């Protein structure tokens, strides 16, 4: 069973609200780097970056971060017969002494964010990392919390939250899937 909990209009308003919150918190946008966790987190990061640039006229740098080899559940994520291929990030941008705005689609156990923080070290030592999450569904296994949340959606562990983006799904929406 599927229920749409965020439609396209709400999706874009959420992107706009998160972007405004980032602008309000950071008077100097020159020290920001936006890092999107591949796959859907990277597309959301791009939308946030575009909105911030549109509102402020800035040119905030960004990268897409592949965390495949930093995950602690790799044996479950890939079929045994297939080895993952490391693609790294879209470009190399130093985050040394910068504030990183780390973006992902769903916050669940916190393990993806832990892996992203490990991967981020390869790009330098950030002065600060702030977390943007489009949907926080609870059920944390690690002590991780978001600085900017699009929507809190309490779920059962058996439910799934699916953030759909134009690049991968042909639309912008969020669905709650239950058995």
From Swiss-Prot:
This is Bifunctional protein PyrR. Keywords: Glycosyltransferase, Transcription, Transcription regulation, Transferase. It is an enzyme of class 2 (transferase). InterPro entries: PRibTrfase_dom (IPR000836), PRTase-like (IPR029057), PyrR (IPR023050), PyrR_bifunctional (IPR050137). A motif (PRPP-binding) lies at residues 100-112. GO terms for biological process: regulation of DNA-templated transcription. One of its GO terms (molecular function) is uracil phosphoribosyltransferase activity.
